[in-house]
């Protein structure tokens, strides 16, 4: 399993209004959200928001904290909202497994140490 992480800083509104298309894309577009057997996270200084994607194919993917969170586990001080945009899968939270289909959502509250993503079928990964 591999977790990729990037950090985006907030832009000054007076500067941002002068950005051309290329610069706007550089500052705001998250291009690599889904990749097989990877969790990709982008932390934005706008509201300290994390946008991420997980695509379990050959292995389960465990949501681990990244250094900037300064936490022992990912949901130590934050909540997670999940929307499945792929095939059927499961999310295991603290040992309880939730089935999640296409366009279904799951809320994970603060304080849950274990979050694991799995696909039901690797030919149609969640």
Predicted regions and their residues:
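Short, conserved beta-strand element in jelly-roll/cupin
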Residues: 74-90
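Conserved short histidine dyad/triad with adjacent acidic residue
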Residues: 32-35, 50-75
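Short, glycine-/Ser/Thr-/acidic-enriched flexible segments
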Residues: 56-57, 88, 113
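Ligand-binding loop in jelly-roll beta-barrel domains
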Residues: 111-126
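A short, N-terminal "cap"/entry segment at the start of jelly-roll beta-barrel domains
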Residues: 2-53
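Short acidic-glycine-tyrosine-enriched beta hairpin
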Residues: 93-110
């Amino acid at each position: 399993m591999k977790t990729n992480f990037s950090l985006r800083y907030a832009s000054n509104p007076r500067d941002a209004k002068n950005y051309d298309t290329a610069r706007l894309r550089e500052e705001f577009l998250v291009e690599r959200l889904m990749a097989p057997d990877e969790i990709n996270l982008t932390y934005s200084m706008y509201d300290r928001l994390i946008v991420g994607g997980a695509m379990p194919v050959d292995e389960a993917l465990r949501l681990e904290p990244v250094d900037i969170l300064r936490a022992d586990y990912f949901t130590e001080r934050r909540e997670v909202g999940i929307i499945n945009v792929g095939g059927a899968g499961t999310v295991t939270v603290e040992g309880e497994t939730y089935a999640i289909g296409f366009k279904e959502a799951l809320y994970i509250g603060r304080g849950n140490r274990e979050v694991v993503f799995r696909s039901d079928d690797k030919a149609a990964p969640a």
